[in-house]
């Protein structure tokens, strides 16, 4: 039997447990950390310990990995507003206890009123700010549709899965130094792109130990609990989204919301040295990129090169350069463009891509300049869940940029994405 390996984007989903696992080197939430964590009956890994604990509790209550992933995502929408969301979108890839491979695409979609030149001025010059911030930057959110699409694989009622997020929004949670810095750093943008001050703005600065309470978000989550997917894409919440769009000349309409559907697509699956690797298909490039890179190195004796040696690093760099060149040229949304997946993933093609690779010969130093070293992004978040039944789920969810468009839906309490810039 082949071992199963689950991949999303370029992130290998490592199934470790709750609050102790953030990073061996970086601890943004000021909690105790450990290099390893173990569990016998399931595990949850996410960007915030509170959200991870929500997922663990769902597992303890008899839920499976799909249930825990849903609850964790909803909790992240409360405790990690910079990336966790209900106003954005995401990808889910999973392997079920019955051996089925699943991928769900619930990324944001362009509103029907969008046009090719909507971000150009009268002279045809791009107006970058319009696609990055404010109402016109937002696509139709897909997160809630994605959660309900994946719920059919769960065991527990949706109301039970969303209740922890409602409680966190209603009662609040204590913010850490990193969260205080993040909110304070975005204060001017929140003021600029909202007609009324959202809950993320205080007259004084946020301080570690402050409690962030989100009553409007709690009310929105209750509508979703009570009315299901229609509690977001129709009714009061949809009305509030469209009213917000009108205030800022955005494009999302009631029809856009009502017509949104998450799409279950065949996952990418390939063999690598005895493992079956499962990845997200287009419009995510992650699965195909991983397939290209792993297949380019499969017939090379990488073990003998050693870990992090100049030879192994050079090989990986050259492999990634070729894969990302293909990404820029050939990959896209297959609803609109034809992506030559079969060719890009064929062994013959990948062998040809590596024919000009020369071990020990790198790009000339005189054309290499120092790069900019940035901290870990706060703009997209990932979570992974494994349960005792044999289900494994990996999710990437995002608003695109940190805090998305910086626009909060007045009366509904959640941030909208700026995915139109992606």
Predicted feature locations:
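Internal maturation/activation junctions in enzymes
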Residues: 195, 299-398, 412, 419
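A short, polar/charged loop-to-alpha-helix boundary motif
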Residues: 114, 402-417, 421
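Glycine-rich phosphate/pyrophosphate-binding beta-alpha loops
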Residues: 278-287, 380-384, 396-407
């Amino acid at each position: 039997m082949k071992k199963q390996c689950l991949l999303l984007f370029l992130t290998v989903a490592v199934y470790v447990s709750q609050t102790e696992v953030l990073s061996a080197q970086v601890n943004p939430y000021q909690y105790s950390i450990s290099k390893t964590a173990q569990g016998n009956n399931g595990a949850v890994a996410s960007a915030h310990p509170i959200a991870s604990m929500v997922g663990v509790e769902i597992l303890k209550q008899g839920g499976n990995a799909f249930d825990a992933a849903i609850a964790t995502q909803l909790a992240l929408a409360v405790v990690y507003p910079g990336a966790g969301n209900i106003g954005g979108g995401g990808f889910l890839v999973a392997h079920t206890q019955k051996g089925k491979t699943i991928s769900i695409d619930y990324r944001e979609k362009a509103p029907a009123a969008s046009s090719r030149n909507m971000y150009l001025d009268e002279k045809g010059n791009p107006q970058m700010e319009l696609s990055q911030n404010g109402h016109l930057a937002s696509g139709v959110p897909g997160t809630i549709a994605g959660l309900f699409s994946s719920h059919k694989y769960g065991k527990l009622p949706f109301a039970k899965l969303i209740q922890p997020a409602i409680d966190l929004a209603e009662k609040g949670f204590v913010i850490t130094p990193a969260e205080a810095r993040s909110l304070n750093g975005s204060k001017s943008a929140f003021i600029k792109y909202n007609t009324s001050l959202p809950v993320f703005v205080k007259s004084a600065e946020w301080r570690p130990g402050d409690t962030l309470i989100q009553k409007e978000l709690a009310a929105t989550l209750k509508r979703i609990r009570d009315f299901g997917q229609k509690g977001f894409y129709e009714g009061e919440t949809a009305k509030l989204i469209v009213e917000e769009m009108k205030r800022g000349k955005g494009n999302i309409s009631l029809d856009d919301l009502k017509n949104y559907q998450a799409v279950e697509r065949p996952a990418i699956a390939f063999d690598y040295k005895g493992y079956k690797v499962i990845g997200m298909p287009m419009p995510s490039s992650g699965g195909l990129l991983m397939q290209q890179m792993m297949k380019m190195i499969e017939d090379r004796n990488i073990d003998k090169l050693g870990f992090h040696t100049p030879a192994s690093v050079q090989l990986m760099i050259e492999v990634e350069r070729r894969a990302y060149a293909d990404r820029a040229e050939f990959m896209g949304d297959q609803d609109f463009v034809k992506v030559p997946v079969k060719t890009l993933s064929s062994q013959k093609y990948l062998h040809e891509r590596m024919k000009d690779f020369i071990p020990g010969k790198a790009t000339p130093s005189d054309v290499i300049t120092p790069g900019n070293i940035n901290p870990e992004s706060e703009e997209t978040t990932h979570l992974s869940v494994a349960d005792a039944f044999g289900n494994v789920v990996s999710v990437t969810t995002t608003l695109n940029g940190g805090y998305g468009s910086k626009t909060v839906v007045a009366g509904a309490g959640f941030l909208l994405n700026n995915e139109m810039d992606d």
